[in-house]
Amino acid sequence: MNLSYLVACGLMITLLSVRMGAKPLSQAQQKSFRSLLGEELAEFLESEEKERRLDAVRSRLRLLRDLRMDTRARGVWARLLNDQPVPRRHKTGIKKGGSSRSGCFGHKMDRIGTISGMGC
């Protein structure tokens, strides 16, 4: 039973690994093919060649765009991982007195810190 599964999997892998590809026509074959098909189909074949070229240009543009996006992502990571301290802006205003309202370093304590008394 297991042997049949193993053989079936091996056969599937073998079939998947075989590539089905078309070989390009030589110049002589293309000329004879165009003479048989006529001008209309010859133009169609030429348009396919143009389409292939256009696809190649599109793929190059896609690669350049991906490269640009990759450098942007690197820049974001570099900014995030930068070790330089960022200057902090402190709010300037009237501070209300009272030790119950302020916790560590003059900042307002959160609810858990105020209730439990575990704050600074």
Swiss-Prot record:
Chief site of localization: secreted
Disulfide bonds, paired cysteine numbers: 104-120
Entry coiled-coil feature ranges: none
Compartments reported by the entry: Secreted
GO BP term, pick one: blood vessel diameter maintenance
Pfam families per record: ANP
Signal peptide: 1-22
Prosegment location in residue numbers: 23-96
Keywords: Cleavage on pair of basic residues, Disulfide bond, Hormone, Secreted, Signal, Vasoactive
GO cellular component: extracellular region
A GO MF term: hormone activity
Physiological role: Exhibits natriuretic and vasodepressant activity. Has cGMP-stimulating activity. May help to regulate body fluid homeostasis in a variety of aquatic environments.
Family: Belongs to the natriuretic peptide family.
Descriptive protein name: C-type natriuretic peptide 4
Organism, scientific name: Takifugu rubripes
Lineage: Eukaryota, Metazoa, Chordata, Craniata, Vertebrata
